[in-house]
Amino acid sequence: MTQTLSQLENRGAFIERHIGPDAAQQQEMLNAVGAESLNALTGQIVPKDIQLATPPQVGEAATEYAALAELKAIAGRNKRFTSYIGMGYTAVQLPPVILRNMLENPGWYTAYTPYQPEVSQGRLEALLNFQQITLDLTGLDMASASLLDEATAAAEAMAMAKRVSKLKNANRFFVASDVHPQTLDVVRTRAETFGFDVIVDDAAKALDHQDVFGVLLQQVGTTGEIHDYGALISELKARKVIVSVAADFMALVLLTAPGKQGADIVFGSAQRFGVPMGYGGPHAAFFAAKDEFKRSMPGRIIGVSKDAAGNTALRMAMQTREQHIRREKANSNICTSQVLLANIASLYAVYHGPVGLKRIANRIHRLTDILAAGLQQKGLKLRHAHYFDTLCVEVADKAAVLARAEAAEINLRSDIHNAVGITLDETTTRENVAQLFNVLLGDSHGLNIETLDKDVALDSRSIQQSMLRDDAILTHPVFNRYHSETEMMRYMHSLERKDLALNQAMIPLGSCTMKLNAAAEMIPITWPEFAELHPFCPPEQAEGYHQMISQLSDWLVKLTGYDAVCMQPNSGAQGEYAGLLAIRHYHESRNEGHRDICLIPASAHGTNPASAHMAGMQVVVVACDKNGNIDLDDLRAKAEQHAANLSCIMVTYPSTHGVYEETIREVCEVVHQFGGQVYLDGANMNAQVGITSPGFIGADVSHLNLHKTFCIPHGGGGPGMGPIGVKAHLAPFVPGHSVVQIEGMLTRQGAVSAAPFGSASILPISWMYIRMMGAEGLKQASQVAILNANYIASRLKDAYPVLYTGRDGRVAHECILDIRPLKEETGISELDIAKRLIDYGFHAPTMSFPVAGTLMVEPTESEGKAELDRFIDAMLAIRAEIDQVKAGVWPLEDNPLVNAPHIQSELVAEWAHPYSREVAVFPAGVADKYWPTVKRLDDVYGDRNLFCSCVPISDYQ
C-alpha cells in the first residue's frame, strides 16, 4: 500500500528516537509481563478514577529540525543589547575548549549527583578544584561545592548564622543597604518563615542595633563602591555577631579576601567565571565559612578520603548534614547544587590560571578607570571614589542619556536616583568604552582612550591600598599547568573518563528519572539569543524568552491539570519551598495563619520534611500500611487531631514505594475536609504525563522536576528546575520579584530565587522535548517507562523480591528490590551489590531509599530492551555470585562482591583472592568495559579526616 504524504513526513520521528524499545521490542516485553498492549497495561496499573479520558492538548509532535527552526524564530525576537546593568550579572567569554568538551559533552552533562564516588572521580576532582578556588579567593577554611545562586546563598548564610550564633536570644539580622536588591528580596522571604526581623540600613550603622545575631555586608556594593569592612568586622566580632560578606569572584582576584578581615561566611556568584548570563541562570554560587562552622554549612562538600587499597580518592563528605538523612533537622532543604556550572567556573580558572585571571581582572579595572577618568574630566560626578568594575555616574539629563543608550543598543542600570550604573566585564573593549563616552557625553567629547590609559596607569587610586590583595592565589599545580588548549582538552578528557554517565550506560536510579537528554533539546541553550540576555534587561528585549516561557507554561498547565505555573524555583527542593509558601500565604489571606501542621507520609523523601521546616511548618508523620500505602485510618486520625491547625499534606504520586495508590483521591478529600491543602510532589511525574495529572487527582500545588520528567540533564548534580503548578486560588501567592514584574502574575510575594524566571536559559530544553513529543508521544513515554519497570520487576522477582506492588502485582515506573532477606542469609548487602554493578558497567540503583536494605530501580522510557536485558543479566549474575558465597565457595570476607569495584591495576598486581581476575573485572563476559579508577571508598576515614582542598598532583597519578 502506498504511504500517505503525512506518513512520509513522519512528524513524530523524534518519539522513536526518545523512546528506547521499538514496537516489536515493546510487544516482546508486554508478552513477558502478561499484557496485551500499553493501554491495557496502563489500565491495569493506574486507578480507573484518575485516568484521563483524552491526552492533554499540547499539540502534535514536530521533527527535531522543525522544532529547532520554530524555536530559533522565537529566540530571534530577543534583542541582544550590550548590557552594563551589573547587579551580579555580567557578560562572559566561555573558552571554546570548555564549551565543546564540557558544556556540549554528554559525558559531563548527563552524569548524576556523585553519591557513588567510585564512578564520579572526574567531576569530584573538578568540584574539589572549585572549592580550592573558593578557599583561595575568600580566605576561609571550608568551602562547599556550590549552591543555587547568590541570593539563595545569602539566605543560607542568614540561616547558618542563626544556627551557629551564641546569641541565642537575638532574633534580628542586619543587611547593609547596598546589597543587590534581589539578594535582599530572597533573604526577606526566608526570614519571614523563620521569624527573623530583617534590618536594612547603612553598614556604618550596624553597631547601632541591638539583638542582632548576624550581619550581611557586600564587599563591592550594588552600585560599585568597594568597602573596607575590616574595622567594622572586628567590632562586630567583639560583640559575637556572625558576619557574612557577599563578594565577587573576579573582584576577589584583586581585592583583599574577606576571610582575612575576619568574616565568618563569604558567598557570591561564580557566574562571571565563564558562565553565560542566560537571562538569569543557571549559575553556581560559592559559599565558604570558618572551619569551626563546617558542620553547620549548607550544600555539598567534597572531601579527600582513601579507597579500600589506601589510595587517595574523593567523595561527598559529611552527608549526615543533608536532607536525605537529617530530614527536618537538615541544614538546608536544597538537594540540587549547580555542579555543571561550578565545574565550568572551576575549569575556567584552571584554563586561565592565576596569571590569566589577574590579567582579565586588571583589564576590566583598567577600562573602568579609563571610563571614570574621561567622565570626570568632562565634569560628570561619580558617586564612589573606590570601585572595581562598576561606576555610579550622576547625570543631569538622565532621560537623554538613556535614550542615547537605547539608540546605541546599550543597557545601563537605570533604577538609581539621578544616576546611571555602568558595570564593565571581560568582554568589554576599548571600543566599547569609546561608545560609552558617546552615550554619556555626546559625540563631541574629544576624549582619547590611549591618553587616558597612560594617565590612569600611572596613578590609579580607585582601589584603596588597604583593599589590594597581597597574598598569592591558585598556587596549586592544577591551576598552573593546563594553559594550552591541547593540555586543557586532555585534562578534561582525563576527568570525563573517570566517570560513568548516560553516554556509556543506563543509570537506573529510582526517583531520579535519568532519561535521554537529546542533542536537539540541548542545542538551543548555547544560542547567543538565549545565552547573552541580562535578567534585568527591559522586557521588550526579551520577547522571545517571554513567548517561549509562556508556551512552556501553557503546556505544563495542561499536562498538570493546574491553572497557573511559576517558573522561578531553581530546583525541585526550591519548588517545594515555594509551593509550601504559597499554601502558607493562602491561609494567612484567610486569617488562618495559625495553620502550620504539615502531614508527611513516613515513606517521603527527606526533602519534604526539610522544606516544610524551612517554610515554618511543623511536621506530623503519617504511617504507611504493610503494602507501603498511606494508612488512611492514621491519616484521618492525624487530620482530625490537627484540624484546627492543619496546613497541608505532602504526598508523592506514584508513591515513593513505586506504586499507584488506589486511595489517592480519598487522601486529597480527607485533607481538604479538615481545611488543608494538598501538595503533590512532582518527583514521579514521569509516570503521570498523559495518563493522569495532579490537578485531576485533586491536588492544589506541585513542583515539577524539569531535570527529571522534562529532560533537562542532571549535569552531575545540577542544574535543575522546579517550577510549581498551582490551582487558581493559590496563584496570587506564588513567588514574585522585586526587580522585574513577572507578566501575567498578580503575586506580591517575595522571591525564592535571584532571577525572576530562575534558570531561564535551560527552559528551551523542556520546550523542545514537549514540542517534539506532542501529546501522544508524551503519553507513550510514560507508558513505556511503566512497561520497562514492570519488565525488570517481572524478570528479577524470583531472584530479588519486589517489595511493594499494586494491583495484579504490578509496579509503577520504578520498583524496589528487597535485599534484606539475602543479607540475612549470606551477609551480602545492598551496598555490595551496588558496588559490584560497577564491575558490570552500571551505575547503582538508589540504595536504601525509601526502605533501608533495598535497591530502587527506575529504567525510564529511554532505555531499549537490549540495555534492560544487559542490566537484568548483570543482576542475575550477581545473584549467582551471592549463591556462591552462600554455598561457601567464596568466603564472606573475600569475594567479588565485598571487594567490588575492581580497578585496572589489579590485573597486574599480586592476586590472592579465591576468584579469578576474569571473574573480578570481566564478569559474565562483559565486553564494553567501564573502568573505575578507585576501589570502594572508606567513608568513615573521610568523615573522621575531613580535608576539602586540592591534594598534590602525585596523588592522582
Curated annotation (Swiss-Prot):
Cofactor(s) needed for function: pyridoxal 5'-phosphate
One of the record's GO cellular component terms: cytosol
SUPFAM superfamilies recorded: PLP-dependent transferases
EC nos: 1.4.4.2
One biological process term in Gene Ontology: glycine decarboxylation via glycine cleavage system
Catalytic reactions on record: N(6)-[(R)-lipoyl]-L-lysyl-[glycine-cleavage complex H protein] + glycine + H(+) = N(6)-[(R)-S(8)-aminomethyldihydrolipoyl]-L-lysyl-[glycine-cleavage complex H protein] + CO2
Domain of life: Bacteria
GO molecular function: glycine binding; glycine dehydrogenase (decarboxylating) activity; pyridoxal phosphate binding
Subunit structure: The glycine cleavage system is composed of four proteins: P, T, L and H.
HAMAP family found in the cross-reference section: GcvP
Function: The glycine cleavage system catalyzes the degradation of glycine. The P protein binds the alpha-amino group of glycine through its pyridoxal phosphate cofactor; CO(2) is released and the remaining methylamine moiety is then transferred to the lipoamide cofactor of the H protein.
Protein name: Glycine dehydrogenase (decarboxylating)
Organism of origin: Salmonella paratyphi B (strain ATCC BAA-1250 / SPB7)
Gene symbol of the encoding locus: gcvP
